[in-house]
Amino acid sequence: MGNDLRAGEDTRVGCAAVMLDWVLFDADGVLQSSRAGWMEELTAWAAPRVEEFLLAVAAADVACLTGKDFGGAMREVLRQFEIDAPLDQVIDQRFWIEVRQPMLDAVRAVRDLGLRCALATNQQNLRGAYMRSSLGFETIFDEQFYSFELGFAKPEAGYFQTIMDRINVAPSRVLFIDDLEGNVDGAREIGIHGELFPVDGGVAALAPILARYGVQL
């Protein structure tokens, strides 16, 4: 969806001290988690070098958050561990993500109040493309901001500044919610209101955060 508004329309929501136009939501640990069984499915390919394999996969993931192809990086990992199976067999997309439907319903409720909502997440290109194409997020969010597309990753200032440029609002009118303290600090450094979210805290954790800004679910 675009972010154009009718001339003169004011959709800000907030308390006397803070007026918000946008809420940015992190994905993993806030709106979604790894699907049950995914880790077991992945590590079965690397026994008995499971720990070493997981470290290599994690390193490939981090190296690709700002645009490098994760598929190419992972195929190199598979060669190193002498895994002959194709990548899409080793990493089954069906096991990647389990969305928290109550949290998505809460995002809809926030939008119904007149606020714009965006996904703001660090993702490598394969996982990010899967999220964009397969989870229906285009019907939930006004915008989706993936690090692999922006060329910056949280907590870099460039990540948050690029989003501010895209949505064309002052940072003081934006709330960012993330489960990693470093990312929250990065948002605050450029003037965004940042709130730390307890991992998989659900709507019970989201409601009081929003209430501090005058947004009632």
Task: Give the location of each predicted region.
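Short, surface-exposed acidic
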Residues: 47-57, 81-92, 215-217
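Hydrophobic/basic alpha-helical segments enriched in Actinobacteria
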Residues: 45-48, 81, 198-203
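Asp-based, Mg2+/Mn2+-dependent phosphohydrolase catalytic module
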Residues: 2-23, 120, 124-217
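Short, acidic loop-to-helix structural element flanking the phosphoryl-transfer center
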Residues: 90-117, 157
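A metal-dependent, Asp-based hydrolase signature
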Residues: 62-90
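Active-site neighborhood of HAD-like aspartate-dependent phosphohydrolases
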Residues: 9-58, 189
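Short glycine/serine/threonine/alanine-rich loop segments
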Residues: 48, 83, 115, 169, ...
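Alpha-helical elements of Rossmann-like donor-binding domains used by nucleotide-donor carbohydrate transfer enzymes
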Residues: 37-41, 56-59, 72-76, 105, ...
